[in-house]
């Protein structure tokens, strides 16, 4: 299969080679890229870790990861090609001198080194120092880091300062995997390639916007991490604000990385501050109690293994967000995300204003709003709810709600939509930063989020309980109902 012209010859170095992220996401994605013919024939994959492995041992680990986490049977021909790329470097990231071993394996003259930090952010400074001291940080070397970075503006700045000491911003790729999802990428095309939306995407025509990211799972044994982060830092700061920016941004001058990111930063700077004076009015936070998920009884958050019984960490957040700019003044954005909700789904719903004059009162006293639903997962696609006349000989215009539906898998006849990590890995190899988050984006998001988390801490108001398997605390319904609106119902 032909390799695309943009595929570059790389040494992909995975720090944390035996970790969960590498095994669940990175390795299966690399297999799919191999299958699609997107990896340059001379690209290598080098795992890094403290394990006393050689190439053969690491190859066995990779094979086991693919067998465990891929839904398809491994093609032996593809496996032979992929496994030939593999190598392993035994390295403790806190041992700066040991990075010379990695340097001896790399081919900086003929290959671009991509350092993927599949490890906790607390290790990033040590890794960058090791790479820098071993002179492995010169352009065009790149580093890839997973968000969220830190737990506040201050800790995020500390991490970015450590990275910035050895790598320039043009070398840094901060991953938010939601930006690699096909339907999120489609937002740019949907908004800016169709005059229907280009000319009807502001406070003159849109009433409000809802963004929901619902998780069916609990904390999945990650108590130590999650209790320090909570749903606000883990999901709102990390994913939902990026989706909000893609919905709310003004048209960029072009599709270059900085043009797109400049517009997203403008949105983040326009977010109305939420602090102690309005935090109870604008936010709801909850914590799941025992209930049922996927037909099984599940424990509450405070009953999870390793739990601190007095924890006030939120597992659910709902927020009314106001954007103070000319495009969105008066249009609320409602965000909600939580764990142990009834289903796993992510969607954006844009509600359009109803006509000022209703000509069809005989059929419908109060016309329902047209709404555009962008399904991020599952069943990726877009649908528009409109009113149509019911066929018949009746002289009245009997109206009925119908949907114009674009399902990705059906419309494009694709059984496999590329996983977000497939695209993002490929973009790092191409050297394209448009789908990655710039430092000022991260810091503007943290400024806004910190104001809320600080207000919660000062307010000393415990999260509202909600039973596992339900749509969060009743207070989240009350928040949106006060504005005369309601959350979208999932079918």
From Swiss-Prot:
It catalyses: D-glucose 6-phosphate + NADP(+) = 6-phospho-D-glucono-1,5-lactone + NADPH + H(+). It comes from the Bacteria. GO terms for cellular component: cytosol. Its EC number is 1.1.1.49. It is an enzyme of class 1 (oxidoreductase). Substrate binds at residues 177, 181, 215, 234, 339, 344. Pathway: Carbohydrate degradation; pentose phosphate pathway; D-ribulose 5-phosphate from D-glucose 6-phosphate (oxidative stage): step 1/3. Keywords: Carbohydrate metabolism, Glucose metabolism, NADP, Oxidoreductase. GO terms for biological process: glucose metabolic process; pentose-phosphate shunt, oxidative branch. InterPro entries: G6P_DH, G6P_DH_AS, G6P_DH_C, G6P_DH_NAD-bd, NAD(P)-bd_dom_sf. Pfam families: G6PD_C, G6PD_N. Gene3D superfamilies: Dihydrodipicolinate Reductase, domain 2 (3.30.360.10), NAD(P)-binding Rossmann-like Domain (3.40.50.720). GO terms for molecular function: glucose-6-phosphate dehydrogenase activity; NADP binding. The active site is at 239 (proton acceptor). The keyword Nuclease does not apply. Catalyzes the oxidation of glucose 6-phosphate to 6-phosphogluconolactone. NCBIfam families: PRK12853.1-3, zwf. This is Glucose-6-phosphate 1-dehydrogenase. It comes from Escherichia coli O157:H7. The gene is zwf.
């Amino acid at each position: 299969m032909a390799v695309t012209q943009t595929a570059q010859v790389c040494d992909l170095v995975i720090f944390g080679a035996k970790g969960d992220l590498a095994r669940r996401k990175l390795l299966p994605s690399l297999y799919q890229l191999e299958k699609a013919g997107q990896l340059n024939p001379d690209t290598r994959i080098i795992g890094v870790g403290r394990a006393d492995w050689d190439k053969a041992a690491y190859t066995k680990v990779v094979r086991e990861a693919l067998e465990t986490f891929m839904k398809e049977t491994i093609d032996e021909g593809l496996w032979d090609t992929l496994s030939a790329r593999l190598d392993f470097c035994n390295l403790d990231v806190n041992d700066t001198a040991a990075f010379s071993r990695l340097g001896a394996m790399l081919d900086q003259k003929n290959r671009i080194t991509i350092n993927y930090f599949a490890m906790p952010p607390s290790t990033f400074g040590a890794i960058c120092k090791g790479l820098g001291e071993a002179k492995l940080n010169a352009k065009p070397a790149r580093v890839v880091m997973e968000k969220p970075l830190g737990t506040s503006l201050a800790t995020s700045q500390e991490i970015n300062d450590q990275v910035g000491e050895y790598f320039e911003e043009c070398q840094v790729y901060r991953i938010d995997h939601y930006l690699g999802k096909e339907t999120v990428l489609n937002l740019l095309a949907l908004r800016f390639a169709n005059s229907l939306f280009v000319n009807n995407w502001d406070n003159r025509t849109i009433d409000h916007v809802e963004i929901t990211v619902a998780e069916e799972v609990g904390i999945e044994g990650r108590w130590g991490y999650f209790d320090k982060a909570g749903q606000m830092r883990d999901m709102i700061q990390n994913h939902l604000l990026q989706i909000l920016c893609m919905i709310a941004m003004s048209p960029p001058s072009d599709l270059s990385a900085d043009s797109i990111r400049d517009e997203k930063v403008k949105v983040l700077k326009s977010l109305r501050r939420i602090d102690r004076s309005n935090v109870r009015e604008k936010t709801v936070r909850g914590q799941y109690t025992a209930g049922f998920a996927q037909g099984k009884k599940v424990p509450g958050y405070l009953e999870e293994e390793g739990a601190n019984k007095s924890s006030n960490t939120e597992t659910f957040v709902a927020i009314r967000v106001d954007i103070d700019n000319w495009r969105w003044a008066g249009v609320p954005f409602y965000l909600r995300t939580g764990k142990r909700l009834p289903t796993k789904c992510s969607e954006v719903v844009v509600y359009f204003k109803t006509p000022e004059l209703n000509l069809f009162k005989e059929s419908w006293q109060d016309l329902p709003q047209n709404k555009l639903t962008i399904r991020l997962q599952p069943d990726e696609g877009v649908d528009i709810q409109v009113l149509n006349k019911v066929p018949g000989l009746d002289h009245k215009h009997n109206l009925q709600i119908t949907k114009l539906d674009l399902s990705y898998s059906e419309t494009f006849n694709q059984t496999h939509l590329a996983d977000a990590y497939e695209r993002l890995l490929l973009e790092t190899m191409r050297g394209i930063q448009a789908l990655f988050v710039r430092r000022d984006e991260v810091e503007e998001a943290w400024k806004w989020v910190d104001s809320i988390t600080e207000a919660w801490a000062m307010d000393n108001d415990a999260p509202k309980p909600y039973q596992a398997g339900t749509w969060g605390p009743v207070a989240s319904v009350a928040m949106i109902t006060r504005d005369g609106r309601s959350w979208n119902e999932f079918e």
